[in-house]
């Protein structure tokens, strides 16, 4: 059995695990990622996905003259997801997500070379009760596979990659 020693242990080499590892390496921490698969297959379910990402008041929405806001997105999310303050952490998480997704996700990945098809998708509109009131789903150019490949490559080529162990 291999033994690892690091400041941070991350379970799972999906997108969240890869991004967490990148951030930890940036912070000077040593990192071990433990996954059921080999590093070449990291990316989790995102690697197999169509690549849709939910952003609020994004540059692509503004270019298309789609007026959106975190308040509007949260109202839509609560309607479609049937969330209320009684849902506690899920409700709070959804609120923070719509407030921060463009700045903390979109603006994090686009400098890495991730781009989006110039068409916004309007999913989860709701059949029996209202859902998204404007298009918010951005499709990664190259699908989720491209997202996983770009992030995985950034991880493997990181300046502190010697502080990274994959198990």
Language-model regions, residue ranges each:
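A short, basic/flexible loop-to-alpha-helix module at the beginning of a structural domain
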Residues: 1-5
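N-terminal Rossmann-like FAD-binding beta1-loop-alpha1 element of flavoenzymes
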Residues: 6-33
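Active-site-proximal beta-strand/loop segments in catalytic clefts of secreted hydrolases
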Residues: 13, 36-37, 57-58
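Proteins synthesized as precursors that undergo proteolytic processing into mature forms
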Residues: 19, 29, 38, 101-102
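Glycine-rich FAD pyrophosphate-binding loop
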Residues: 26-47
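Short, hinge-like loop/turn segments at secondary-structure boundaries
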Residues: 48-53, 136
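Glycine-rich active-site loop/strand segments that organize a redox cofactor
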Residues: 52-98
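Conserved redox-cofactor binding core of oxidoreductases
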Residues: 94-167
